[in-house]
């Protein structure tokens, strides 16, 4: 991303999207897309999603023995009961270490252009490998994960079923593929906003419609559009003015750590806003605890806008329409330890 590109983007953000008089549903349909399960197949690459992989991935998602301490699982930081995130500003990992950023939601993550706030993982397979190996998170190694899973006959049988053509089905790569397969099922369709996009004008009320109109016309949809209302591209954080050090620490340069380009300093993947009402606290630092504060902060720092309390309330009301049907996942009974299963290390 060049500095000229950022400058051009910033200029766009400082002015609202053109307010088009007319039908709100028509205008919204030009910017947003309802969730449809048929979209999943078009975005998952190099991984055939089968029922056997999904079932194996469900177990692995809840499997604490993927971590060195055998205390932490994917579900520890991505709690499916609380919007696919945990409750703190940043997650607590191995040895009670605190992570540097807020855990992104796993719900609808399959629709994101890439994973993590800085987009360093191209897909959910790559993302699944990261926390397992991160010293501040699960602090494990691929070899140790393979040894652990291979030590439990029930897992060996499930890997063989999920990857029948592989000579060595129990592998770190296949662990990640199974987790990805499961996570493709973690979508939240049928939000009231989806019903509105599909033609039901009564699905959202007048205040929520006002919030939607403001969301479009003020420029919020410039970053938060598409099926996930975000997650599709990268944008500088602090266009009109720099957020406070608490919200945007100077030491965290965002995407430039991935691209190695200073042009990407403080550039982050736009947060997807589906189910956002369930996911406080907000931003990559997790330092904003209410949607009202988050909306006002983004209006000021990104769009150079000062919202009235009524405008803020209307936008927050609209954001509440983005909560969809939450996944109904049965908590799995995991395979018992084998005689050679490694012991936990704290």
Show where each model-derived region lies.
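Bacterial N-terminal signal peptides
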Residues: 7-17
């Amino acid at each position: 991303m060049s500095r000229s590109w950022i400058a051009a983007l910033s200029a766009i953000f400082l002015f609202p999207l053109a307010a088009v008089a007319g039908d709100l549903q028509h205008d919204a349909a030009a910017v947003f897309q309802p969730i449809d399960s048929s979209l999943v197949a078009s975005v998952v690459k190099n991984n055939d999603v089968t029922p056997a992989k999904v079932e194996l991935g469900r177990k692995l998602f809840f499997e604490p023995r993927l971590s060195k301490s055998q205390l932490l699982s994917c579900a520890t930081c991505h709690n499916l009961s609380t919007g696919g995130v945990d409750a703190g500003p940043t997650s607590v990992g191995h040895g009670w270490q605190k992570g540097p950023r807020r855990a992104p939601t796993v719900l609808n993550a399959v629709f994101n252009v890439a994973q993590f706030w800085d987009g360093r993982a191209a897909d959910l397979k790559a993302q699944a490998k990261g926390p397992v190996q991160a010293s501040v998170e699960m602090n494990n190694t691929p070899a140790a994960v393979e040894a652990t899973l291979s030590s439990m006959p029930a897992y060996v049988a499930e890997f063989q079923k999920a990857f029948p053509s592989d000579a060595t089905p129990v592998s770190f790569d296949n662990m990640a593929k199974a987790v990805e397969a499961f996570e493709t099922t973690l979508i939240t369709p049928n939000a009231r906003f989806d019903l509105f996009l599909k033609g039901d004008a009564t699905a959202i009320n007048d205040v929520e419609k006002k919030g939607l109109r403001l969301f479009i016309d003020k420029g919020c949809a410039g970053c938060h559009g598409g099926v996930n209302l975000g997650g599709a591209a990268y944008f500088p954080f602090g266009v009109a003015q720099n957020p406070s050090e608490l919200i945007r620490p100077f030491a965290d340069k965002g995407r430039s750590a991935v691209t190695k380009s200073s042009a990407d300093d403080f550039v982050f993947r736009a947060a997807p806003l589906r189910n956002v009402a369930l996911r406080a606290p907000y931003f990559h630092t997790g330092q904003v605890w209410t949607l009202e504060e988050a909306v006002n902060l983004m209006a000021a720092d990104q769009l150079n806008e000062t919202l009235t309390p009524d405008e803020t309330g209307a936008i927050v009301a609209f954001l509440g329409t983005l909560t969809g049907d939450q996944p109904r996942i049965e908590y799995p009974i995991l395979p018992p330890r084998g005689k050679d299963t490694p012991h936990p290390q704290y």
